[in-house]
Amino acid sequence: MSGHATSEDGRSTLGTSIASASTHVETYEQGMNVRREVLGAEHVDRSLSQVSDFARPVQELVTEYCWGIVWSRDGLERKTRSLLNLAMLTALNRSHEFGAHVRGALANGASVAEIQETLLQTAIYVGVPAALESFRVADAILREIDNSE
């Protein structure tokens, strides 16, 4: 079964990796730590302070599952996950989330050149208009970072 984790006897360990989290609270806390490390504590705190009671459950889901389980897996380095996110968010044309993940990619060790190459590669497969928007957002963030240094 190539493509996902297996135990020594060849069985999939996907379900056990999710089930082995001792509690939702621990997974949520781990997710919050990873989320803050990748996106920056200030960004996460600001975002969560603005969450309505209606939207709070989806933020909890994202923190626990996305950050606490998926981003915490050993299969890919954080930099690789960040570059993949930039490509996927470009394909989905999600500028707001894309901007946060540009900062996250830099925090995870991606270079400006690697971000640029990821966006160029993405342009070919998802379309130039989507990539142009991502280049615009990334450029604005990179300029902002340069001006703050």
Feature-to-residue mapping (PLM):
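Short alpha-helical scaffolding segments that buttress acidic/His motifs in well-ordered protein cores
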Residues: V62-C66, L83-T90, T118-A123, S134
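Mid-chain, well-packed structural core segment of small domains
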Residues: L83-L86, T90-Q116
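Acidic, glycine/proline-rich low-complexity segments that act as flexible tails and inter-domain linkers
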Residues: S2-K79, A107, E133-E149
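Residues at alpha-helix boundaries and the short loops/turns that link adjacent helices
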Residues: V38-A41, S95, G109, Y125
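Substrate/cofactor-recognition hotspot
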Residues: V128-P129
